Amino acid sequence: MDFFGPHLLAYFIATLHFLGTLAAIHAVLTVRTAQGSIAWALSLMFMPYLTLIPYLIFGRSTFDAYIQARRQANQEMHTAITALNWRPWVEEALAARNSSAYASLRAMPKLGRMPCLANNEVHLLINGDATFSAIFEAIRNARTAVLFQFFIIHDDELGRQLHALLKEKSAEGVAIYVLYDRIGSHALPHRYVQSLRDAGVQVKAFATRSGWLNRFQVNFRNHRKIVVVDGITGFVGGHNVGDEYLGKKPPLAPWRDTHVQVTGPVVACLQESFAEDWFWAARELPPLILPDAYPEDGVLCQLLASGPADPYETCSLFFVEAIHAATERVWITSPYFIPDEAVFAALRLAVLRGVDVRLLLPSRPDHRIVYAASSLYAIEAVRAGVRVFRYTPGFLHQKVVLVDSEISAIGSANMDNRSFRLNFEVMLLTVDEAFAKEVEHMLLDDFALAHEVSQEESRETRRLQQLGMRVARLISPIL
């Protein structure tokens, strides 16, 4: 006992460094990006007492067993869906190929593994009041089934309105399916969920895998926000269910976000995306509904659902393809700006082509380390010729892309490593000049409420502040 006493701390530190070395080797072998591998390996080698536990939580970005299990579940889901003769979009897909605008999206159907579909109708929903008024109205009018998926559901005023409405519709005989992310909705009380289940609502939490350790796994989160009512009306965008998304909670209020409402053949793609996630959580299919007929005209839409089990880094490639497609302008709004090398290079090249490249970012942080890393990338973007704007009234959370005069995309994907490689995301692309004009007007209103970062400001950043930003950027691949 006398021998171990003085040396116990030394043994403990040596053990931590040994485990850190093993974890560093694991990071080099498994983390998807070189930047992420280097960041994890160095921190695990030299500071294992600070980074070993976070690595177990954040670092397993290519957990092969999970990815294989998810792919197997997707295959089983598609086998089950084939038995339902789920062929909703043949005529609409052919119509899309005959469209002159189809060429601008030629890579997207292969990238997203879903067809580009014609004859859709889309409506822009600006901010929380418009979004949840439209969603709740659609649910009130539901007759058959409601598919409801959000990253975050809070037990607050808005969450309780949703709770009461879902119970009411379930009592009327409508099939209600609710899917929320276990980490994103970690504060949702059990009584909230159990009350819905007691009322006949099907509720599942999206989790990576079972097991004690995976309760702390914050990678592979389901960040999608999807609502489908009766297989006819769909919603997708950036909002979650909570009072802060209505701009009711300082210091981030007023909250700026965007959703889109859609009808037409692309709603079938929304249902299929929901079905994949529901099948993973429940090992059964939700009701999938096709309307008797679709409109004979409308706009071109492409759903892009991305996730860590994809054969490609779908979300990152989406941004690269959208930026490369621009000949006149590409305007992007995101709460976080931590691009990978491919996306940042695409932005640089767009500037060199003479494209009007603009980024709209928040002026206040919700996560300080992420904001610091984002700020350094924003400074570098300004120096590369990108026009960077900071939205000043409140927190900007919308995820919108506008390319030239026809192409727009609205959904859940941020411009950061987590959306690019670790989370499940969904974006709705629309090819239509009139809708793009609506998005343009919305963004022009946002730019009018924003402060443009000048070249001089980017040079005036204090050295200590720059040091903090660079440290934050160093760990940005693992944020």
Swiss-Prot record:
Q: Kind of enzyme, top EC level?
A: transferase
- Record InterPro entries: Cardiolipin_synthase (IPR022924), CL_synthase_A (IPR030840), CLS_N (IPR027379), PLD-like_dom (IPR025202), PLipase_D/transphosphatidylase (IPR001736)
One GO BP: cardiolipin biosynthetic process
Q: What residues make up the catalytic site?
A: 223, 225, 230, 397, 399, 404
Topological relation to the membrane, as annotated: Multi-pass membrane protein
Report the transmembrane regions from the record: 8-28, 38-58
Q: What is this protein called?
A: Cardiolipin synthase A
Query: Which family is annotated?
Result: Belongs to the phospholipase D family. Cardiolipin synthase subfamily. ClsA sub-subfamily.
Q: Where in the cell is it found?
A: Cell inner membrane
Q: What does this protein do?
A: Catalyzes the reversible phosphatidyl group transfer from one phosphatidylglycerol molecule to another to form cardiolipin (CL) (diphosphatidylglycerol) and glycerol.
Q: Which coarse location class applies to the principal site listed for this UniProt protein?
A: membrane
What SUPFAM superfamilies does this protein's entry cite?
Phospholipase D/nuclease
